[in-house]
Amino acid sequence: AAPLPIAKAIGAIQSHSTSNPTSFAQVGAVQALNGPQDHLDLWLSEFSKRRLVAFDKLNAIEGISCVNAQGAFYLFPNISGTGMKSAEFCERLLAEAKVAAVPGVAFGSDDYIRISYATSMTNIEQALERLAQFVSKL
């Protein structure tokens, strides 16, 4: 446990940052919800393309399988075919291929990793090419 003065200070920061949004933020949120929404179709289309490219490239890698995402901008590929658990896989992937992924153990599933496709198509393609090369050398 933290010393009492530190715990109180952290509690105050947490309280102020997660409750009672300021009035200007509330007005901005209302405008975002009620304002023009035409940009959403463009973003949905772009993220759908990114998701499909990442999904296809992941499933083309021997030892990795992935189901298609239903929301957010993450994929959760199964890496059990590589013979490694998620933390070791992610550590080595970062060190050897310079690709960051989140170990699935943090989400309750040690045979999976989480990757984001909230980046450019170029970055997605480059990262997944590096991931494929990394897995091929295992």
Model-based region annotation:
Residues 1-138:
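PLP-dependent class I/II
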